[in-house]
């Protein structure tokens, strides 16, 4: 199981969790977080979101095209490993949301 802290404007908003065994993903807002939602599709009022595939909002933070190819090649990341891709670029995303892997 891999986890990543998710920040909105530098404030920790919640955690993204990848359950590789069951091939599922969850995003959970921190109980004390009362800032803006990280996405209009993920309101703060609902504290937990579950996905069968990599969450669309986080997929939208990933590089595409030439930038994706360079990332996969230089970091030796599998094309199907969206979580690792996000960890590689998570602190340098476009917009207010950043992501940082939780060390084991």
Please annotate each region the language model reported.
Residues 1-104:
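Phosphate/dinucleotide-binding and metal-coordinating scaffold of catalytic cores
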């Amino acid at each position: 199981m891999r986890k990543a802290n998710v920040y909105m404007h530098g404030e920790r908003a919640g955690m993204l969790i990848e359950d590789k065994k069951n091939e599922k993903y969850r995003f959970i807002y921190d109980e004390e977080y009362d800032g803006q939602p990280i996405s209009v599709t993920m309101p703060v009022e609902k504290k937990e979101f579950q996905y069968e595939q990599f969450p669309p909002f986080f997929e939208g933070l990933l590089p595409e095209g030439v930038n994706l190819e360079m990332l996969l090649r230089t970091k030796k990341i599998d094309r199907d490993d969206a979580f690792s891709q996000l960890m590689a670029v998570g602190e340098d995303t476009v917009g207010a949301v950043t992501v940082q892997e939780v060390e084991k």
